[in-house]
């Protein structure tokens, strides 16, 4: 009888431990979703929380290209479409709901400049041609912008090959960004860390 009671108690403890572990796992899964490409998904709330700890760097691919679409061009044929501009504006409004304080940069192409302008709705934009050149030197260029921004959060409009390079170099994953997709990085002690993919919402 005593042996049966001890086994019963142990089984109850095991079940309680198992139930607790499942609750923790479920909680982590709901708070830290993962993209199919292997990158953690970071929404606006998570980004805001990260920005309270370190300066964040959000790198967006430009909006829909006019020269690769049948949609109406915003203006210049080397820029973005009207649809792309509207999407950039909507994304900017959603982004600013969580991150109000940031400096804005773009590469020196019409499509990135237009994307950044519509995203920010009037915020001052600095154009930096180094945001077009993506390779090992991209990190030094980003750190230079952080210093210029006095370690404020920064938003950069750049190109798909830049985002692909960073994802592969920092996390060893293949990232093929669509228009207006973004990566989130943070700076700590002079080093840049890739946190994941920005997912609005």
UniProtKB/Swiss-Prot annotation:
Its EC number is 3.1.3.-. Pathway: Bacterial outer membrane biogenesis; lipopolysaccharide metabolism. GO terms for molecular function: phosphatase activity. Residues 1-35 form the signal peptide. It comes from the Bacteria. GO terms for cellular component: periplasmic space. NCBIfam families: PRK15416.1 (NF011945). Belongs to the phosphoglycerate mutase family. Ais subfamily. This is Lipopolysaccharide core heptose(II)-phosphate phosphatase. It comes from Salmonella newport (strain SL254). The gene is ais.
């Amino acid at each position: 009888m005593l042996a049966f009671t001890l086994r019963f108690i142990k089984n109850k403890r095991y079940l309680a431990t198992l139930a607790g572990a499942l609750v923790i796992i479920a909680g982590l899964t709901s708070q830290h979703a993962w993209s199919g490409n292997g990158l953690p998904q970071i929404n606006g709330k998570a980004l805001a929380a990260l920005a309270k700890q370190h300066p964040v760097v959000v790198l967006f691919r430009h909006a829909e290209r006019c020269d690769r679409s049948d949609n109406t061009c915003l203006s210049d044929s080397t820029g973005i479409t009207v649809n792309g501009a509207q999407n950039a504006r909507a994304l900017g409004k959603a982004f600013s709901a969580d991150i109000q304080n940031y400096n804005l940069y773009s590469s020196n192409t019409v499509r990135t400049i237009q994307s950044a302008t519509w995203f920010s709705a009037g915020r001052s934009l600095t154009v930096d041609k180094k945001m077009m050149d993506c390779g090992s030197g991209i990190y030094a260029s980003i750190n230079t912008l952080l210093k210029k921004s006095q370690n404020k959060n920064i938003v950069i409009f750049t190109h798909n090959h830049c985002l692909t390079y960073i994802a592969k170099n920092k996390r060893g994953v293949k990232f093929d960004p669509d228009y207006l997709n973004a990566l989130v990085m943070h700076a700590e002690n002079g080093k840049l860390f890739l946190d994941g993919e920005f997912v609005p919402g």
